[in-house]
């Protein structure tokens, strides 16, 4: 079987709260690091989430 093109990534809050989301990303279409605005329930506002590695 061939390996899939989608890899699991972790989106970590830049607010410093330690909150994170997990999602998948197609490495062929998006080789750069992802940054997206999402809601941080700890900070109770929308903040930027940056891609980090899943340990």
From Swiss-Prot:
Residues 1-24 are annotated as: Disordered. The keyword Zinc-finger does not apply. Residues 1-11 have a biased composition (Basic and acidic residues). One of its GO terms (biological process) is translation. Gene3D superfamilies: Ribosomal protein L33 (2.20.28.120). Residues 14-24 have a biased composition (Polar residues). Disulfide bonds: none annotated. InterPro entries: Ribosomal_bL33, Ribosomal_bL33_CS, Ribosomal_bL33_sf, Ribosomal_zn-bd. Keywords: Ribonucleoprotein, Ribosomal protein. One of its GO terms (molecular function) is structural constituent of ribosome. It comes from the Bacteria. One of its GO terms (cellular component) is cytosolic large ribosomal subunit. Belongs to the bacterial ribosomal protein bL33 family. PANTHER family: 54S RIBOSOMAL PROTEIN L39, MITOCHONDRIAL, LARGE RIBOSOMAL SUBUNIT PROTEIN BL33M. This is Large ribosomal subunit protein bL33. It comes from Burkholderia multivorans (strain ATCC 17616 / 249). The gene is rpmG.
């Amino acid at each position: 079987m061939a390996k899939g093109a989608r890899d699991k990534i972790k989106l970590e809050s830049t607010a410093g709260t330690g909150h994170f989301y997990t999602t998948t990303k197609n490495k062929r279409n998006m080789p750069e690091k992802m940054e997206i605005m999402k809601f941080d329930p700890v900070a109770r506002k929308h903040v930027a989430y940056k891609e980090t590695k899943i340990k």
